[in-house]
Amino acid sequence: MKNIAILGSTGSIGTQTLQVIDANPERFNVEVLTANNQVELLAQQARKFKPNMVVIGNEAKYSELTELLKDEDIKVYAGSEAIAQVVQTSTIDVVVTAMVGYSGLLPTINAIKAGKTIALANKETLVVAGDLINRLVEEYKVAILPVDSEHSAIFQCLVGEHNNPVEKILLTASGGPFRGRDYEYLKSVTAAQALKHPNWSMGAKVTIDSASMMNKGFEAIEAKWLFGVKPSQIEVLVHPQSVVHSMVQFQDGNIKAQLGVPDMRLPIQYALTYPERVHSEILRLDFGIYPDLTFEKPDVTTFRNLGLAYEAMNRGGNAPCVLNAANEIMVAAFLKDEISFTAMSDVIERTMEKVSYIVQPTLEDYIASDQEGRRIAKEEFLNLKSQI
């Protein structure tokens, strides 16, 4: 029986993680659930799964959550500091980091220092501070098991290949809802259009990142840190069917690929049960439904965010941290229809140019770079609005 903490239990990954746990009650026990704002859903989950503790990030909702759970024997806490602290609870075996964005960094660091296995769904942790995270993982000798479908695929392809050098990682991308569209078309797309992903069911932030291909850029950076490869060894391939989740090419020229239906419960379950493979009722892949599996190069001229992510990855230091900070500000603005889809890249690029570059950042440097990146992105965004 594994005791699980889920950070971000009310989001897309969090709710699907609970579905996996619900289907395997003899294997998993829910120890901690956290959410940021969705207090009613968090309370509903707590009543069903009976964790020892729940945390609501938004402190203004603490009394509401306490009232909803007054008849349950569950400890209730509030605030980001509480989220960062509960992961250190001695009874926890695995921490599922399903929070979105930069907010996942400090809880993940604390969980590593507490010796917990990390089921990593919060890619921004490695985007922002991959070098620091890898050093901590080595120091505290913990395992990071990827939950992202692409990184789970790469991880699975590498099982049994410990001594065999990787030549290249082929990171697949659906291409999002705007695949094949030109730059002029993208100038006028709306948030509602961008939120209609062709293959995956995800939260709003990740869906917008997928549409802009920033998500794939983040995943390339994540792959660099997870698998110890150079940026030049990570090739993005657009694969509209989302059946081949990623591939690994070895130095002898052979390629291994991992395939499956586009259902996040598959990589979630693999991360939770690793190294075992446990039966699931998830739909099996029917090749008759997918007679053609196609691949194409990404259009980095139109989808500039992918190029910006590679630029940040090649530069290293605090550049990916700044990239993420600016992107979070821009996605929030785009979701409110305050900025155009293409202008997001303009602001991100300017922010990356203006924030002070640090070659080997400390945790304090990463925190400061995130703050500076957000401040400058807001300034650049306001400057852009004033010119319209």
Across the structure, where does each feature detected by a protein language model lie?
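Catalytic, metal-anchored helix/loop core of enzyme active sites in primary metabolism
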Residues: M1-I388
